[in-house]
Amino acid sequence: MATVPVYCVCRLPYDVTRFMIECDACKDWFHGSCVGVEEEEAPDIDIYHCPNCEKTHGKSTLKKKRTWHKHGPGQAPDVKPVQNGSQLFIKELRSRTFPSAEDVVARVPGSQLTLGYMEEHGFTEPILVPKKDGLGLAVPAPTFYVSDVENYVGPERSVDVTDVTKQKDCKMKLKEFVDYYYSTNRKRVLNVTNLEFSDTRMSSFVEPPDIVKKLSWVENYWPDDALLAKPKVTKYCLICVKDSYTDFHIDSGGASAWYHVLKGEKTFYLIRPASANISLYERWRSASNHSEMFFADQVDKCYKCIVKQGQTLFIPSGWIYATLTPVDCLAFAGHFLHSLSVEMQMRAYEVERRLKLGSLTQFPNFETACWYMGKHLLEAFKGSHKSGKQLPPHLVQGAKILNGAFRSWTKKQALAEHEDELPEHFKPSQLIKDLAKEIRLSENASKAVRPEVNTVASSDEVCDGDREKEEPPSPIEATPPQSLLEKVSKKKTPKTVKMPKPSKIPKPPKPPKPPRPPKTLKLKDGGKKKGKKSRESASPTIPNLDLLEAHTKEALTKMEPPKKGKATKSVLSVPNKDVVHMQNDVERLEIREQTKSKSEAKWKYKNSKPDSLLKMEEEQKLEKSPLAGNKDNKFSFSFSNKKLLGSKALRPPTSPGVFGALQNFKEDKPKPVRDEYEYVSDDGELKIDEFPIRRKKNAPKRDLSFLLDKKAVLPTPVTKPKLDSAAYKSDDSSDEGSLHIDTDTKPGRNARVKKESGSSAAGILDLLQASEEVGALEYNPSSQPPASPSTQEAIQGMLSMANLQASDSCLQTTWGAGQAKGSSLAAHGARKNGGGSGKSAGKRLLKRAAKNSVDLDDYEEEQDHLDACFKDSDYVYPSLESDEDNPIFKSRSKKRKGSDDAPYSPTARVGPSVPRQDRPVREGTRVASIETGLAAAAAKLSQQEEQKSKKKKSAKRKLTPNTTSPSTSTSISAGTTSTSTTPASTTPASTTPASTSTASSQASQEGSSPEPPPESHSSSLADHEYTAAGTFTGAQAGRTSQPMAPGVFLTQRRPSASSPNNNTAAKGKRTKKGMATAKQRLGKILKIHRNGKLLL
């Protein structure tokens, strides 16, 4: 039977509950209590030798400490920071001098520290009670020792102990700590600060002060039968040895604290809970090296308060303090929540939650205590309303803060985090609603009482003082309407001359002190309504009105530009008896108004563009309007009137053409005086402009930036007699200069007529020219040779009908000359058939002419051909701009990048493959030459089709456009033909996609419109001699059985439009839905381009 191994000098088996250490010599294990080694000391031992091995191997050696500035008494390196709590830190802290706490600590006898005293004076500063007499505090006799604490609390009680030198917490039994306390050789500095003994036998020896019992929420409002037990924070025992130090902290939950020193002495380092100090504390506490920074060095003042034996110190909510124990000390303490500083308690609680601090003196169930207090306040409000009394102001303010906290805790996203502390059987939503109602009733009642008090006083000074206090700080509310000022100033003008001194109040050299925070809080709560009440009650008194007008006039004159100096002369008088009393108040308001005007002007200039210096006077004129001076317009913005100015200066009525719409787009963009959002500083608040500048329209404008880039590299344009060379000067060019559009080019005689009648022919031509211009951007003479001569000849005739200028360049024998000739045709074509396009397309034509170096001889040579193409000037084209806000951008998106079927993207690199020289006709385009030429060709080819149809079956005679479905046109456009057609690949004239798509679009228009306009027919017959015969005769010779591809489209789809019989029959029929107007028909026809290229 194996024996159980034994260890240590006591030769006992291994015990898991006892600390043991191994000897490095004999490798045996020893209990720490048997060999005198504490568990906390073991990490510092490098080599341990048991008592038996010490005789042969020597004593144990400790680790070499390299951070004496942190944990040891040795010399500290100058480079490394001092650790808080180390011996070097304590030494420096003792030698440092601090401001005396006499300035902030109130010394009050215990008998005077009552509830009435606290409500009257508040509890915002520490209170030191020299003796416990009259305080109601019960503590043991001074002969009470630490050993007595062990006896009454229990030696096995586990306590949290702070290692001061390392600023770390550990747990020990009370017996072990008491043994350490009475030991003569203290190797460490240990501190017990959170021994709560309210549930032990020692609780009967200690009772908190009476004032704490009366103020504490937990003592008064927490039900005894609640499911959650009361927080045990009222009775703490502090056992601190010499040089114990607790770093700066805020008590958990923002609770107030009381300390009574039974034995020894304690030193408190107190810091006010100002907003800046709390922010600094939060930043310091969240730093990883906060234990190496003394927080008192970061604030303006830290007060030193020494509490000696028998004294009691009360520390209010939110105060940041640290404690030092110069000698061994035994003290008692407690924490409590109260209604005198609810706001500070809530703020400290939020800071604690953000920092996620694990304080040793945690206030458990803080939110539960707040809920119980809220329920009590609701009952108190109801009782006060029934009795006709008013609750104290601090309770009303505390109820508002609590109700706001309740709302935040019960929000949907935060409820899961806070519902654990919600008391049982509570209806939070109902409590919040009822409490808000009672608060509102209480505030209304208090405001109703206030005018009565003012009436009893019946003094001008009192009225003026109330008016000054309750006047809101907003410059808008402080300024009456301009019309009221003018009326009063007219009446007061005679008094102005007599009173030179009181009217012009001198500017004080130093600004007066701002009002205290409690006053501003009251002003925030009901400032607006209080102001109204005070104005109504004080309106009959003339001195008040004079004073207000005098101040308002001076404030306005300082806000106005220097040229408005008339306001300085009309100064209102103030009676002599009121000048002495009110001069300081007026100066205060004057400083406030002056600061606001300067800050507003500073923000305006900071956020404005360079032209803002020219616009500031106009804006200040508008600010003087009655709208800006309206008292009810509390939240009006600085540039709210700028919107009115913009609406007056909006675009004039312009042509509905495409570039007319683009010009409107340019003019719509207001000339900005500031950035997209203007922030106006108003006492530290930022207000956002109600009408921001819309930047959305800038994105499409950048799409046209390639036109500007093109202009930068173009050669100097050639001066021509028929084109205005000064067209580059635009009256309404934008500041950025990304797109310049000529608006001064002289149009033709018929241009204004068509412009006024809403014609869109100009816009369509401009679209074609823009498309041609983009399509020809990257062509050069060496890119690729042209197509065969027969193909060029056929396509040239077709494009001369359509006036598609860019593709002429691919038909010339010499590549570069063809480009110049095509641009010449483009320039003259726009001049001849301007119809409203002269103003908008002039600059693009000049750019095109400048790039291709137009020859004047070629220009005259092609003039006759173009004259024959444009004989339909009496035709009125309906506008297409209603499809999109910016049709030029929509139509550009329909273009193709190359000969592929992919749609054109404006952001992609423009460079179509050769020999294609032009883009297909874009959506919204209608060119008269295409209609007339193709209609005439269709008329001739339809007769040939009629002769062929006699030899065919009866089913083919019934072929009409009414029976032709969209699938027919789709299949034809995809390259399939009917029985009378041939594949498009066999026809040489169909090798250019631009010409085929142009012809197909117009042919589809004729075929799908059963009742075309009569102008179209007359024009097509008149132009048939040139367009049809001159172009197609050679191509159609000997091929009567196989007509050309354009004829295929027109023959299959247009017999009703070309045949007189079908035309007469069609007039009797009702037009199709969506095909009544030319605009509808054209829009329907142009959709065939979306499926890809057309093969004829």
From Swiss-Prot:
Superkingdom, natural source: Eukaryota
Enzyme Commission number: 1.14.11.-
Effect on the protein upon substituting residue 321 to H: Does not alter iron-binding nor activates histone demethylase activity
Residues recorded with modification Phosphothreonine: 479
Effect upon mutating residue 954 to A: Abolishes phosphorylation by PKA and activation of demethylase activity
Regulation of its function: Enzymatically inactive by itself, and become active following phosphorylation by PKA.
Amino-acid positions noted as binding 2-oxoglutarate in the UniProt annotation, renumbered to this chain: 193, 246, 259, 266, 321, 323
Sequence ranges of Pro residues compositional bias: 503-518
Keyword annotations from UniProtKB, A to Z: Acetylation, Activator, Centromere, Chromatin regulator, Chromosome, Dioxygenase, Iron, Isopeptide bond, Kinetochore, Metal-binding, Nucleus, Oxidoreductase, Phosphoprotein, Transcription, Transcription regulation, Ubl conjugation, Zinc, Zinc-finger
Phosphotyrosine found at: 728
Pfam families: JHD (PF17811), JmjC (PF02373), PHD (PF00628)
Residues with Phosphoserine modification: 474, 539, 655, 681, 705, 730, 733-734, 738, 879, 882, 899, 1056
Tissue-by-tissue expression: Widely expressed, including in liver (at protein level).
Post-translational changes noted in the entry: Phosphorylated by PKA on specific serine residues, leading to the formation of an active lysine demethylase complex.
Impact upon substituting residue 7 to A: Abolishes binding to H3K4me2 and H3K4me3
Function: Lysine demethylase that demethylates both histones and non-histone proteins. Enzymatically inactive by itself, and becomes active following phosphorylation by PKA: forms a complex with ARID5B and mediates demethylation of methylated ARID5B. Demethylation of ARID5B leads to target the PHF2-ARID5B complex to target promoters, where PHF2 mediates demethylation of dimethylated 'Lys-9' of histone H3 (H3K9me2), followed by transcription activation of target genes. The PHF2-ARID5B complex acts as a coactivator of HNF4A in liver.
Subunit structure: Component of the PHF2-ARID5B complex, at least composed of PHF2 and ARID5B. Interacts with HNF4A and NR1H4. Interacts with RELA.
Free-text comment on this protein's domains from its UniProt entry: The PHD-type zinc finger mediates the binding to H3K4me2 and H3K4me3.
Protein name: Lysine-specific demethylase PHF2
The organism of origin for this protein: Homo sapiens (Human)
